[in-house]
Swiss-Prot record:
Protein name listed in UniProt: L-rhamnose mutarotase
Active site: 22 (proton donor)
Name of the gene: rhaM
Protein's cellular compartments: Cytoplasm
Keyword Cytoplasm on entry: yes
Organism taxonomic ancestry: Bacteria, Pseudomonadati, Pseudomonadota, Gammaproteobacteria, Enterobacterales
Length: 104
């Protein structure tokens, strides 16, 4: 299993809305994430800094990257553009983090 972590931002006035939209996420999106090998996906909110910290375990980089080209992911990204900064393709602005410590 490959562990990934990344940081995104949420608009200061959208903390509650961001959380509402994720509880629960669309069943179709959940199915796509699982079918593409995502496990133990979690997102944490740092309210003071409007930061989102996400962790996910994936089976392969190729399958994980393929999620972005699915119709449901494209619709989800568009749905989220009013609550968080987005790139021109509507994907969330994010930075992948480097793992520096792991205790199994």
């Amino acid at each position: 299993m490959i562990r990934k972590a990344f940081v995104m931002q949420v608009n200061p006035d959208a903390h509650e809305e961001y959380q509402r939209r994720h509880n629960p996420i669309w069943l179709e999106l959940e199915a796509v994430l699982k079918s593409h090998g995502a496990h133990n996906y979690a997102i944490y909110l740092d309210k003071a800094r409007n930061l989102l910290f996400a962790t996910v375990e994936i089976e392969s980089e190729e399958r994980w990257n393929a999620v972005a080209s699915t119709d449901v992911c494209q619709r989800w990204w568009k749905y989220m553009t009013d609550v968080m900064p987005a790139n021109p393709d509507n994907s969330p602005v994010s930075s992948e983090l480097q793992e520096v410590f792991y205790l199994p």
